[in-house]
Amino acid sequence: MELEVFAGQEKSELSMIEVARAILEQRGRDNEMYFSDLVNDIQTYLGKSDSAIRESLPFFYSDLNTDGSFIPLGENKWGLRSWYAIDEIDEEIITLEEDEDGAPKRKKKRVNAFMDGDEDAIDYNDDDPEDEDFTEETPSLEYDEENPDDEKSEVESYDSEINEIIPDEDLDEDVEINEEDDEEEEEEEEV
């Protein structure tokens, strides 16, 4: 495989990201690639050994994710972001997800090896809440609009309760603090 973009350049000086971009550009928009196929094409073009590719694979995958010119298309397929308009990217991903959800999968009956026909034993696997579509009905809460008269009556009742505990007359009295008593108590505690 030859890439026209790199004609006359030393292959050993090229990065895997540059080669990946060139390979995807050469293949065109409708030819997204699986990650493994992309890595194999890069290895073939650069002529690197399996061990060298394995060593640089984590860095390449990180670069592929962080480089803004690549886009994951699901199922480990990759393409160039320039191929897709922003709205089209969402549509492409959504259609892939819809294809997966098309046929519901049957759940297999779980077999418990410790329940040898014992009818009195409790099978806790049957109690899995994920197995049932359970929706708890929540009662709708209705709130009345705030009524200023209600608030006023609440404040008045609160004030009357406070006045029963401490009459307003007692609140106006000045309180005298005797500092000598405090000093004597501190001296007694130290002894």
UniProtKB/Swiss-Prot annotation:
InterPro entries: Asxl_HARE-HTH, RNAP_delta_N_dom_sf, RpoE
Organism, as annotated: Streptococcus agalactiae serotype V (strain ATCC BAA-611 / 2603 V/R)
Family from the record: Belongs to the RpoE family.
Domain of life: Bacteria
Residue ranges of every copy of the HTH HARE-type domain listed in the record: 14-83
HAMAP family per record: RNApol_bact_RpoE (MF_00357)
Keywords: DNA-directed RNA polymerase, Nucleotidyltransferase, Transcription, Transferase
Record protein name field: Probable DNA-directed RNA polymerase subunit delta
GO molecular function: DNA-directed RNA polymerase activity
Region (Disordered) location: 117-191
Biased composition (Acidic residues): 117-136, 142-191
Quaternary state and interactors: RNAP is composed of a core of 2 alpha, a beta and a beta' subunits. The core is associated with a delta subunit and one of several sigma factors.
Keyword Repeat: no
A GO CC term attached to the entry: DNA-directed RNA polymerase complex
The protein's role, per its UniProt record: Participates in both the initiation and recycling phases of transcription. In the presence of the delta subunit, RNAP displays an increased specificity of transcription, a decreased affinity for nucleic acids, and an increased efficiency of RNA synthesis because of enhanced recycling.
Residue ranges of the TM segments: none
GO biological process, one term: DNA-templated transcription
